[in-house]
Amino acid sequence: MDLGIKGRRAVVCASSKGLGRGCAEALAAAGCDLVLNARGAEALEQTAADIRAKYGVNVEAVAADITTEEGRAEVLKAAGEVDILVNNAGGPPPGMWSDWERDDFIKALDANMLAPIAMIKALVPAMMDRGWGRVVNITSQSVKAPIGVLGLSNSARAGLTGYVAGTS
């Protein structure tokens, strides 16, 4: 199936494994050049090498923590003109509501809501100016049907979903 995105440039966050890697591979198979991001350099570089070898597209790997301004700046500097943004983040871990402290919520919000919003705000204006762009936010079915032990994830991912619904 031709998605009509060959030659486009995509940023894929948390792309060294799991859903992020799957998204990166699907975009590469469709002919997109990629900027991959994850915190772990070794796994990220291996993913980038695997995708380059298999799909023959340009792949840049940026090992950085996207939840920090510095990490986002590194990714955005490498990214240049972006057509597609895939926001993705792992975690936060399951647990009991009675065990979560404010810092647990802040970490969950940073990774699963605030960093994606910052990436959207950084990249979407240029997409709008060019008249073309796509944003994919990997969240969870728990934004519609919360899961008890995933309260940190439920709240942060639902916040991102609400933000996007309010801006689209």
Residue ranges of predicted features:
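Substrate-binding pocket helix/loop in short-chain dehydrogenase/reductase
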Residues: 96-98, 104-109
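Catalytic loop of short-chain dehydrogenase/reductase
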Residues: 136-159, 164-168
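Conserved NAD(P)H cofactor-binding loop of Rossmann-fold oxidoreductase domains
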Residues: 89-93
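A short, exposed helix-loop element centered on a Lys and neighboring polar residues
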Residues: 120-121, 165
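Conserved glycine-rich Rossmann-like NAD(P)H-binding loop of the short-chain dehydrogenase/reductase
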Residues: 32-46
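Conserved glycine-rich cofactor-binding loop
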Residues: 9, 16-18
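The beta1-alpha1 cofactor-binding region of Rossmann-like NAD(H)/NADP(H)-dependent oxidoreductases
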Residues: 41-42, 63-74, 102
